[in-house]
Regions:
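Acidic/His- and Gly-rich active-site-bordering loop/insert found
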Residues: 2-120, 137-146
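Acidic/histidine-rich catalytic neighborhood of metal-dependent amide-processing enzymes
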Residues: 114, 121-179
Length: 179
């Protein structure tokens, strides 16, 4: 297991990882607006497919609201649960944006490159950082270093009304050593 090799792999594949993030950012998964329910569903489908592309046994799970995405990777050692959310805040008032918030762009700034678009920082960027780290680790080392459960919800920005009931119903599956 080589952290240096994994970091080098991340650097060498940064463009592809950025492209995947930009693709997810283009999905207007606004959980608080019923007009975007199909987009929330699309974001969940996108995440399931992306997790499956790196060998994660991932599924979309129905809730009374927006779906959960749950994925598992078997492994030795401790069980890690990673939580994130794929929904985003509304963009109103739209006239305050200098571009379409769902047309993310990589921009050069005096402090370096940044990604501007709704969800880049909260929470799609953070969510994909973990997924991309797992993708790189697996590419370099063949397997992930421990058992991992990926747990993504689509209602965090609307108060997570389905989260606690889902966690109670799936407590055994979601139980982990670390989260």
């Amino acid at each position: 297991m080589s952290l240096d090799a994994t970091l080098a792999h991340i650097d060498a594949n940064l463009s592809q990882a950025t492209d995947r993030l930009l693709e997810l950012l283009r999905i207007p998964s606004i959980s608080t607006d019923p007009d975007f329910a199909d987009d929330c569903d699309t974001a969940a489908d996108w995440l399931v497919a992306d997790l499956q592309s790196i060998g994660v046994n991932a599924t979309k799970r129905a809730t009374p609201g927006h779906p959960m995405v749950v994925g598992h990777v078997d492994g030795d050692g401790p069980h890690l649960l990673f939580y994130g959310h794929y929904d985003v805040q509304p963009v109103d008032p739209l006239e305050l944006w200098d571009r379409d918030p769902f047309d993310p762009q990589v921009e050069d700034t005096p402090k370096g490159k940044v990604i501007r678009g709704r969800g880049a920082a909260d929470d799609k960027g953070q969510l994909m950082t973990f997924v991309e780290a797992c993708r790189a680790w697996k590419a370099v080392n063949g397997t992930l270093p421990c058992r991992i459960t990926f747990f993504f919800e689509g209602e965090e920005e609307s108060g997570s009304p389905s989260l606690v009931p889902f966690m109670k119903e799936n407590a055994d599956e979601l139980s982990a050593d670390f989260a």
